[in-house]
UniProtKB/Swiss-Prot annotation:
Its main location: secreted. GO terms for cellular component: extracellular region. GO terms for molecular function: calcium channel inhibitor activity; sodium channel regulator activity; toxin activity. The keyword Disulfide bond applies. This is Omega-hexatoxin-Ar1c. Residues 23-41 form a propeptide. Expressed by the venom gland. Insecticidal toxin that reversibly and voltage-independently blocks both mid-low- (M-LVA) and high-voltage-activated (HVA) calcium channels (Cav) in cockroach DUM neurons. Also causes a modest block of insect sodium channel currents (Nav). Induces potent excitatory symptoms, followed by flaccid paralysis leading to death in house crickets. It comes from Atrax robustus (Sydney funnel-web spider). The presence of a 'disulfide through disulfide knot' structurally defines this protein as a knottin.
Amino acid sequence: MNTATGVIALLVLATVIGCIEAEDTRADLQGGEAAEKVFRRSPTCIPSGQPCPYNENYCSQSCTFKENENANTVKRCD
């Protein structure tokens, strides 16, 4: 495997693992809202059984309260 092929393979792997998807933004030289939205996570990244984020749309299905290994009730993706 040459260097170029290795770099391409690493970029593809990083994209798949991170579920990163580019979002269209306008140029913002002030560091405002557009600068913060260059990348966003795909809504299908969080698999079943993982903790729910604040925005439930990031779960693959829905969120429900479940008991974790410490007997605490937490929200998990279904």
